[in-house]
């Protein structure tokens, strides 16, 4: 269980990760102009990424490409297929993404669309030894609630897994979303132990005054924080990961507004310091 964080690839990022004590990076491929895409398009670019990571004692825990798979932009669709080819060359076995959603349809009516998109993707991934991990973020887009990712609750996970019936689809488990949705994230860890392929470490702070003013149907009554600065019980969470014999890695997903901009590095170091309390020393490398 190695500790890393989500970021675009760069030499500066790799050096910072090593200096701070991280053992891994989840490479963020979301942006069309991400440095990762520039590097892999060059001759020997993939090898240069591998070499830079190895020189600094780091591994790539996963590749993250989060978009609406059901209604993708053309570059996203093509980019995801490229990742299926790139991942094995980087010795990466997990690609993380969203399911996507037609926001005008119910969750149940999106399941056939999910099946149509993911059945061939999962077959291609299986042929290359790749697992696809779906992050459990609702990606809310206003009210009434629509969102662009249906995979936000255990009931829906069951519908998804039943629809495609593939061993290489699972979850990128993020407790921060489950917390404000009112779902027991510890019980969910236990219930879906065989389907957790990657973990995002992100905390949640409930802003009680705003919640009481706007109700649960309002916006902005919670905010995401670095691990240790919100209300997630990280000691219990990581203890449960050990209890269920989780074999993957953990990546901090930094969306903390207090430590944004120039304070980003300070925030990541703070998150590392907190989570390191609960991770066995031999598993940090």
Enumerate the language-model features and the residues they cover.
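Conserved beta-strand positions in the central sheet of alpha/beta enzyme cores
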Residues: 26, 62-64, 96, 133, ...
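Aromatic/hydrophobic pocket-lining residues that form π-stacking "cages" and hydrophobic walls in ligand
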Residues: 13, 49, 83, 121, ...
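Short, flexible/disordered intra-domain loops and linkers
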Residues: 33-42, 142-151, 262
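Glycine-rich, proline-tolerant flexible connector loops at the mouths of alpha/beta enzymes
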Residues: 26-50, 102-105
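Active-site mouth loops of central-metabolism enzymes
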Residues: 1-10, 66-77, 108
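Active-site acidic/histidine proton-transfer and metal-coordination neighborhood
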Residues: 18-19, 52-55, 71-170, 180, ...
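Histidine-acidic metal/acid-base catalytic patches
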Residues: 1-24, 54-57, 91-92, 144-145, ...
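Active-site-proximal loop/turn and secondary-structure-junction residues that shape catalytic pockets
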Residues: 9-11, 29-31, 66-69, 99-103, ...
């Amino acid at each position: 269980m190695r500790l890393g964080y989500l970021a675009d690839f760069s030499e500066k990022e790799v050096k910072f990760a090593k200096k701070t004590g991280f053992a891994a990076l989840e490479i963020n491929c979301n942006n069309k102009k991400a440095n990762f895409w520039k590097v892999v398009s060059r001759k020997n670019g993939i090898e240069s990424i591998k070499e830079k990571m190895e020189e600094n004692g780091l591994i790539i825990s996963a590749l993250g490409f989060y978009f609406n798979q059901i209604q993708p932009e053309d570059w996203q669709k093509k980019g995801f297929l490229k990742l299926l080819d790139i991942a094995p060359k980087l010795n990466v076995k997990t690609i993380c993404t969203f399911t996507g959603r037609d926001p005008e349809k119910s969750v149940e009516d999106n399941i056939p669309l999910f099946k149509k998109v993911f059945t061939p993707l999962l077959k291609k991934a299986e042929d290359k030894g790749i697992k696809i991990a779906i992050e459990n973020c609702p990606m809310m887009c206003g009210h009434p609630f629509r969102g662009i990712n249906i995979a936000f609750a255990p009931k829906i996970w069951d519908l998804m897994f039943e629809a495609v019936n593939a061993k290489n689809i699972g979850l990128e488990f993020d407790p921060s979303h489950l917390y404000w949705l009112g779902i027991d994230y510890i019980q969910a860890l236990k219930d879906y132990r065989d389907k957790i392929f990657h973990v995002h470490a992100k905390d949640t702070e409930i802003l009680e005054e705003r919640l009481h003013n706007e109700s649960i149907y309002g916006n902005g009554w919670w905010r995401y924080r670095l691990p240790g600065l919100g209300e997630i019980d990280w000691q219990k969470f990581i203890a449960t990961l050990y209890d269920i014999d989780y074999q993957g890695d953990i990546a901090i997903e930094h969306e903390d507004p207090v430590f944004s901009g120039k304070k980003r590095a300070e925030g990541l170091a703070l998150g590392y310091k907190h989570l390191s309390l609960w991770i066995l020393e031999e598993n940090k490398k």
